[in-house]
Amino acid sequence: MKVIFIQSSVAASTQLSKIRLSLLSLIVMTGLAANTANAALASQVLPVKYHAGQYCPSDMKAFVPKGTAHKNFVADISCMRQQLQAYQAEHQPINTRFQAYKADAWLSYVAHERNEASLTKASRYALAEALSIVEALKTNQVDKLPLTADIPPTSGLQRPDLWASLLTIKQTPAFAPLVKTVADSEVKLIWAEAEFCEFGWRHSREHYNTVDRWVATAELTALNTSGVDKQSFNALKTQYLARLKPLAATKNSKESCRGAVLPYIELPKVGMAEPSPQTLTLPVVPVASSH
């Protein structure tokens, strides 16, 4: 009599991944209903003032385009962005990388203004957020910063669908490789909302179109990432969307241009290394020999 050993390690691994994400989704969904913590803004958690000419060490060369009128301000922004690169490195913790990329995105926002005196109210919030994150990174206080900061009062919640996607991605293993895209998308979305609140849809449309593309690509990547179950992802996204929709304005309305408190999020456990699933061996099945 011959004996055939049947193993199903691949199927077991896939099933365990689904179970892990499903359990996480259940925990997060429960937290959405029970946790009312305010995510706050980085600049509220760690307020920092701007000090002109204090951000370029002697060994760093700022990039200042020819013809720049207010060179000191532009140089400060350039030097801060250079300093953030060390915190964006792959070996850094995921929250450190995320905050560093977000600070860089805020500074990119601010860089569109010619000098500190010309900053709009929205740009001042952007600068304040960047300064606080930079300070937190330099002083090892990054864990004090919210993983998802609130929408500042110069903006409003116009696209709950995009925010729901970004919040959901943060709860999956895809957050690690998508950390820059998520950071850039959050700031760009707030930027678009600020443009809408100040100038209307005509001025904000280009920003929204950009975020639409970024988030759509990020979500597709997340759904194709190992360990992400599509059903659990969509269920969690639906929960976030239900939470956010009441905070959003009606179409073409500026009634929500007063900021918004977004759902509180902890750093996702699934973004960390997990032990490899054990191989499951099925019972030995005796098969009669043909001889």
Spans of features found by a protein language model:
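Long, charged/polar, soluble alpha-helical segments
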Residues: 38-291
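C-terminal segment of classical bacterial N-terminal signal peptides
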Residues: 29-38
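Short stretches within intrinsically disordered, low-complexity N-terminal or propeptide regions
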Residues: 13-14, 35-36, 290
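Bacterial N-terminal signal peptides that target proteins for export
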Residues: 4-24
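Extended hydrophobic/Leu-rich segments
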Residues: 16-19, 23, 32, 233, ...
